[in-house]
Design a protein with these regions (language model features):
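N-terminal organelle-targeting presequences
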Residues: 35-73, 90-94, 120
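Hydrophobic/aromatic residues within well-ordered alpha-helical segments
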Residues: 60-68, 178, 207, 242, ...
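Mobile late-domain/C-terminal helix-loop "cap" segments
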Residues: 324-373
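Surface-exposed helix-capping loop/turn segments at secondary-structure junctions
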Residues: 192-193, 322, 370-380
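Short, amphipathic C-terminal "tail helix"
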Residues: 377-403
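Amphipathic alpha-helices that form helix-helix packing interfaces
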Residues: 64, 68, 272, 279, ...
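N-terminal mitochondrial targeting presequence
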Residues: 1-52
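Mg2+-dependent prenyl diphosphate-binding active-site environment of isoprenoid biosynthetic enzymes
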Residues: 80-324
């Protein structure tokens, strides 16, 4: 999709929001296939992922991209009585799903393939795509709700869903409806299979734990007790808000699809997954502060929102009395001068260098734990190694600062 095609697509969205009849005519499977096949052009980050991802083969990646409209069509079969409902879900999906780096979808496929027997790959391929898109759809649900709560303006290089002219307050209904739609897709594809209850449990646990993480994160922001930020609190938020649904969730889906889910496997995924999620959260926090907004496709607002982020935790740990006073007076405020004060404080404390150092130390620690796994562990050590390395190298951070 080139620049002209993207502008044409955006213009069509505005037209379609006003003209439901036009929408029913234009949103066809063929159109959606073309859209999803080229969704990498929606953001620089997604283009980088398509070019450089090594989670799965390029053929698998292409088939995965093309499977979304088929999954949507099947999922909407029982809702043909309401074209408006179908149109709204298609539009929400087209705008919010698949335009990022697709970490969770790719991770789900990588986990599924690593656990499959060779003779199962053809049989389970479609189901693997369904679970991968289910993970991405769940991610989209959380991003849209998070953007509403945070007052974010852009996501993946485009205006946030809740700020679109024809959305506004209806974004709450849209997200609730979309979450239920994900459950409907699971029922349609897996409802008659033995693994269905386990898949439902995994999705429900992911929703619940992530919401708890978001609640705790919001509580930390709202009470403004910034000097109480500690590494322990930071790790707790990360484990619930990021670790489970980013890393553990996709791997558990792979285990369930391949009938290898067990309490022992769950505990191993939880143990290593907590640290991997923490690694990803540290990377996200770094990029919120030091990343390129154009490349990342979103505005960084952790300082303004008063988030319990890695830079904030380090600052509280290292600051002297005077610096803590500056931190308390300016952190969690939206005025430009306050944000600048915090950035200057971070520079004085060399936060950028310390973030890089701590991220590297955690990565090395995770690798050592994986190397110590037994050869017959489930999931296997090579799966953890592949996923950790992909996550660690996911963002092309310009490390001009020496660790």
């Amino acid at each position: 999709m080139n620049t002209y095609e993207y502008k044409h697509f955006t213009r069509n969205l505005n037209i379609l929001s006003r003209d439901k009849l036009t929408l029913r005519k234009m949103v066809t499977s063929k159109w959606l296939v073309r859209l999803t096949r080229h969704c990498s052009s929606w953001s620089i980050a997604q283009r980088q992922t398509q070019r450089t991802q090594t989670w799965v083969s390029q053929q698998t990646y292409a088939e995965y991209q093309q499977s979304l409209p088929i999954i949507l069509d099947k999922g909407l079969t029982d809702f043909s009585f309401s074209p408006e409902l179908c149109d709204r879900l298609r539009k929400f999906t087209a705008y919010n799903v698949g335009s990022g780096k697709q970490i969770r979808g790719l991770l789900t496929m990588a986990a599924c393939e690593a656990l499959m027997q060779p003779e199962q790959k053809k049989e389970l391929r479609e189901k693997m795509f369904v679970l991968a898109w289910g993970a991405e759809m769940l991610h989209a649900f959380f991003l849209v709700t998070d953007d509403m709560e945070d007052g974010a303006k852009t996501r993946h290089g485009q205006t946030c869903w809740h700020l679109l002219p024809d959305v506004g307050k209806y974004a709450v209904t849209d997200t609730g409806m979309f979450r239920s739609f994900v459950s409907e897709i699971l029922r349609i594809y897996f409802g008659k299979e033995a693994i269905y209850p386990k898949l439902v449990d995994i999705f429900n646990e992911t929703y619940f734990k992530t919401h708890i993480g978001q609640f705790i994160d919001s509580t930390f922001c709202s009470n403004r007790q910034y000097l109480s930020f500690t590494q322990e609190k930071y790790a707790l938020v990360s484990a619930l808000k990021t670790s489970f649904y980013t890393f553990q969730f996709p791997v558990l889906l792979g285990l369930a699809l391949n009938n290898k889910y067990s309490d022992k496997a769950y505990k191993l995924v939880e143990s290593i997954g907590s640290d991997v999620g923490l690694l990803l959260q540290m990377k996200n926090d770094y990029l919120d502060l030091y990343g390129d907004e154009i490349v990342e496709g979103k505005t960084g607002t952790d300082i303004q929102e008063g988030k319990c982020s890695l830079p904030a935790v380090i600052a509280v740990r290292l600051a002297n009395g005077y610096q803590k006073k500056i931190f308390l007076e300016n952190y969690g405020r939206w005025e430009d001068k306050c944000v600048d004060q915090i950035r200057n404080l971070y520079n004085d404390l060399q936060i950028q260098k310390i973030c890089i150092k701590e991220e590297t130390q955690l990565y090395n620690s995770i690798c050592q734990r994986i190397n110590n796994l037994s050869k017959d562990s489930i999931p296997p050590g090579h799966l953890f190694t592949k996923l950790v390395n992909e996550i660690y190298n996911l963002k092309n951070i310009n490390y001009d600062v020496k660790p």
